[in-house]
Structure formats: C-alpha cells, structure tokens
C-alpha cells in the first residue's frame, strides 16, 4: 500500500508531467488564462488520462503482447486516446453545456495532448501492473491539474498586476512557469525511486 502512495505522490509532485517532464505544455499555456476554465480542463484531462492509462494497459497486455503487435503500440494508444476523448466530450456536453462551451476547441485537442500519450507509453516502459497504471495515470493527471490551476490563479493575478510592458502576456507567463518548476524541484528529495 505504501508503494502505491509513493507512486502517486512521486507522480504528482516529484515527477510532475508539466514542470519536470515538460509534457502537456500546450494546454498548460493555452487554457490557464481563467481559473474556471483551468479547473474544467483539469477535470476533463484527469478523467481522460486515468481512463486512457488503464485502457492502454489493457490493450497492450491482452491484445498487443499476445499477438506480437508491439510495433503498433503508439498507433493503438493514439486510437484508444481518441475514443476516450470522444467519450469524455459526449459526457461533458450532456452533463455541463457551460463547461463544454468554456473548453471549446481544447476538449477535442486533449487527443493530441502529449501528456496523455506520454502517460500511456511510460506505464508500459516502467512495467506497471493494472493498479499501478491506474494510480500512475491518476497521479499524472492530478499533477497536471494542480499545476494548471495554480498557474491559472497566478495568471489571473498577473493580469491586474503592474507588470512592465516588455514582460506582459506570454513573457511573464513563461517566467512564472519557470519559477513554478524551480519550486517543484524542492520536492525532489521527498520520494526516492
């Protein structure tokens, strides 16, 4: 049980997908201008990453490995992710039309989010079992959501702050992301792998 907790904490804080592995930077910068949009995108991405991680593990274990089709791994994972994203889009459209409108084009773009494909491929490369895959996918998504919500809150405050003209917009956003990455480096001694 401790191993699962350490895997979760290590994935959320120590090996954060955005700030350490630099995966998922497009939605991180694109959706983080408003806090409510970042929260909605975080929930959608959490659902997709967790489900895609589990489904990819199942496809790899029960289809690709027995049939010796490992060379189709990336292509099949992309297909699995696309199906999961379409399912998520249908669920969000039916349950929360306001969130669906807020997310706009970013919801279908979760399909091309490299963090989602990254979590599926890293699960296989690290030889996780089913439960570890689910925890790793959920931890990666929770870390992604945490960083995106924190960054959105900071960006909302920076929008009304007195920032020098050359640093307004993306410049101060990248500086802030760099400082957040340095702050998360403080967690590096928390979990030993």
From Swiss-Prot:
Highest rank taxon of the organism: Bacteria
Membrane-spanning residues: 5-25, 39-59, 62-82, 102-122, 134-154, 171-191
Chaperone recorded as keyword: no
GO cellular component, one term: plasma membrane
Keyword rRNA-binding among record annotations: no
Coiled-coil annotated spans: none
Topology of this chain in the membrane: Multi-pass membrane protein
Alphabetical keyword list: Cell inner membrane, Cell membrane, Electron transport, Membrane, Translocase, Transmembrane, Transmembrane helix, Transport
InterPro entries: Ion_transpt_RnfA/RsxA, NqrDE/RnfAE, NqrDE/RnfAE_oxidrdctase
A GO BP entry: electron transport chain
Location of this chain's protein in the cell: Cell inner membrane
Enzyme Commission number(s): 7.-.-.-
Quaternary structure and partners: The complex is composed of six subunits: RnfA, RnfB, RnfC, RnfD, RnfE and RnfG.
Record function comment: Part of a membrane-bound complex that couples electron transfer with translocation of ions across the membrane.
Similarity-based family: Belongs to the NqrDE/RnfAE family.
NCBIfam families, A to Z: PRK05151.1, rnfA
Record-given protein name: Ion-translocating oxidoreductase complex subunit A
Gene name per UniProt: rnfA
């Amino acid at each position: 049980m401790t191993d699962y907790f350490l895997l979760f904490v290590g994935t959320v804080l120590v090996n954060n997908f955005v700030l350490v592995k630099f995966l998922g930077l497009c939605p991180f910068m694109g959706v983080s201008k408003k806090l409510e949009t970042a929260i909605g995108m975080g929930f959608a991405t959490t659902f997709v990453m967790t489900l895609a991680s589990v489904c990819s593990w199942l496809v790899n274990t029960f289809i690709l490995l027995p049939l010796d089709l490992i060379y189709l791994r990336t292509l099949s994972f992309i297909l699995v992710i696309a199906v999961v994203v379409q399912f998520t889009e249908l669920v969000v459209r039916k349950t929360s039309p306001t969130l669906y409108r807020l997310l706009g084009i970013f919801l279908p773009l979760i399909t091309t989010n490299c963090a989602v494909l990254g979590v599926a491929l890293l699960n296989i490369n690290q030889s996780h079992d089913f439960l570890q895959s689910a925890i790793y996918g959920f931890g990666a998504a929770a870390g992604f959501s945490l960083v995106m919500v924190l960054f959105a809150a900071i960006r909302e405050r920076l929008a009304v702050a007195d920032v020098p003209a050359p640093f307004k917009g993306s410049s101060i956003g990248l500086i802030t992301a760099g400082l957040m990455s340095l702050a998360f480096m403080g967690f590096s001694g928390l979990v030993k792998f």
